[in-house]
Amino acid sequence: AVLQHMLYLQEQGFEVTFLPVDETGLISLEDLKEALREDTILVSIMYVNNEVGAREPVEEAAELVHRLAPKAWFHTDAIQAYGKYQIRPKKAGIDLLSVSGHKIHGPKGSGFLYINEKVKIHPLILGGGQQKGMRSGTDNVPGIAGLGAAAADCYKDFEEKQKKLRALRNYFIEEVEKLPDIQVNGPKEEEKAAPQIVSVSFRGVRSEVLLHALEERGIYVSSGSACSSNKKLPVSAVLKEIHLESDLLDSTLRFSFCNEEELDYCLENLKELLPVLRKYARH
């Protein structure tokens, strides 16, 4: 979503700088520092990458932006981070923050944009002036109510939920790394990795084939982001950017999880399916 808008702005004559990432999906603050200019007006950095789970240094980046480019507003796509981290936008120096309801068990199609009161935004939709003039059109009251309830609920027992997610992630990585010819992608350090996402490459098996084989057994995983699911792209742009080996680009799946029983069921099926699928892939 952010990338397409940046490409659009580039077409309109704006100068846009795209920062590289390392092999775990993280940006370098030094690269950001070098890219900032006095006339920079907007910086957007993903809080958590939705494919490999890299948690970007958002607070440090925001501090750099406000210090070195005082005219710039700082935006973060927090769709994979909201509910998983305690985000305080003003304290973190975040001017704009995007959230999507379905990631916190809210109604699909709902979401919100946090806007610092200092930021003045022109509406894209004109009309009746609903939502304080920011988005005209009849309010989706059930969606708003559901999103509000989900937002209130997702931070209840936060520490306990975090501990559970971290334990599940660590357990899954420990077990999946016992399988032959696999590679776990993204940061290894807990503080740099989201607790709910694990990216795994399975050498010798196409991701689409493994995805459907798991699907037939009631296990639902992803081979890319929802943002790119409607685009006929040969491989994920994210996986290319982290310089994944060419033979792994089309052999990578993203896992999220709920409980240990589901993980055990998934791991059992991976152990059973991988040798069979690799055998057929060689023929």
Residue ranges and their predicted role:
Residues 1-283:
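Pyridoxal 5′-phosphate
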